[in-house]
Amino acid sequence: MLENSRGAHESGPRLHPRFSWGTTLLVSLVMLLPCVWQSRIQSIDLSSHIYNAWLASLIAQNQAPGLWLAHQANNVLFDLLLAGLLPYFGAAATQQIAVGLAVLVFSWGAILLISHRRPQNWWFVLPSVAALSYGFIFQVGFFNFYLGLGICFWYLALFFSGRWQKRLLITPLLALAWLAHPLPVLWAAGLALYTAVAERVPAPARLPLAGVAVVVLLGVHFWLRVAYHGVWSIDQAWFATGANQLLLFDRKYSVPYALLLAAWVMMLWGLVKERRLRAIVGDLMFQRWLLAAAAVSMIPAIITFPQYALPLSFVTSRLSLGAGVLLAALLAQVQPKRGEKVVLTLSALIFFGFVFRDAQKLNRIEDQLDVVVAQLPRNSRVIGFLRIPSKPIPPLLHAVDRACIGHCFSYASYEPSSRQFRVRVAEGSPIVMADYDDVASVETGEYVVKAGDLPVFLVYLCGPDRQQVCSHQLREGEVIDSVASVHEPE
């Protein structure tokens, strides 16, 4: 049923009446399974996050010359969680606990937001949420953003169903989410503002109101491109469904992506037949997804803020995750047919099968990396160049960070020089590069070793299939990529 024209509020976040605490626990355990099914969680930036949590502990003990902790109001919540857990649980368990908590916050926030209209639609909700929870944003390890977005899902689920008293009471959730990352808060605040205004206008006036909101987004688009050198492409519109979260590191992921998208299209067609297009377009839930899709399409994918050495990147992929959950909230109003249930289930099973197999391969390489790093002198400076040729985004980009914990220093760790995180570096630190341009050159393999870097070791993929790990003590004037092209161990 559509909302009333004025002052209507949607039903509150609720689960199926038979969805007991036991079932809630079971679903939570299933959601957490990918956090414990391998020896390590494979997520690109996670290695950097846990390593810098270890650096933060060294800073607190005055054992990290040239490093210091910045006091900042955002992009720190996940890092604070890691830093708080690390002294008590060690690096391995800390990663599993912190990531597991983030997954539960995100997945249950998404479930409540998707299910607030039709709580009994579990055949649709669970496969969709599971896949989105472990999609691209999880795999690249943007956990401050991920955690912040999960908190914002809880906020929106409560906001959409509450009157002004409840809406005021839940405002602190936005402050907590801001501590994680500002982008989800701006996204959620925009949706909440639109909802609050739309509820107070007649239903026929809501679509023009959405048009005004799109024009505002267009203004933001041009402002970011001019003021902050935003990089934008028309291709961003392809990300509006959020199904692209299933497209990971190679072409095989196009199979679960296509299946999920097909199931969603079939359900959308069923919703159109059940509700009629005009009724759907006038629905607040559709308009929220429309605005989220417009943000995906219009907000530049890369934004350069002057206070940071590293641009805010993958903005389109980040926003598409929220758009995917809002589209799922719209589609959850129709019960999937048997064929759609099969396609949704197949999509999730194939996706997680691929994720498991890829994580297994990466962990085998990381096992070798641990052995090689352990053989290097204690407190050595180490550079990692672990590019897998067939992967457009290197999944082991920061793996040497994790391998160095407690033994060595990842000399090209990107967080301190980026100025986006709380661990910062001063010029001349013996622990990590202070210039982000040097770090970026290391990642591309173009860096030329300087006298001031020595002594420093390189660990890199070697062997005919690039599945082995080798080490080399670098010399002044050597180029990272040239050394890494040697396939045989020294």
Residue spans of the language-model regions?
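Transmembrane catalytic cores of multi-pass membrane glycosyltransferases
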Residues: C35-S48, N62-Q63, A70, N74-N75, ...
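Short hydrophobic/aromatic helix or loop-helix immediately within or flanking a transmembrane segment
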Residues: Y51-L55, W68-A91
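Transmembrane-helix motifs of polytopic, lipid-linked glycan transferases
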Residues: I97-R118
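Short acidic/glycine- and proline-prone juxtamembrane loop motifs at membrane-interface regions
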Residues: F138-L147
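Membrane-interface transmembrane helices that cradle and orient dolichyl/undecaprenyl
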Residues: C152-L168
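Hydrophobic/aromatic-rich transmembrane helices and adjacent perimembrane loops
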Residues: A309-P336
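Signature aromatic-anchored transmembrane alpha helix within multi-pass, membrane-resident enzymes
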Residues: Q333-R357
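Short periplasmic/luminal acceptor-recognition loop of GT-C membrane glycosyltransferases, typified by
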Residues: L362-I365, V372-P464
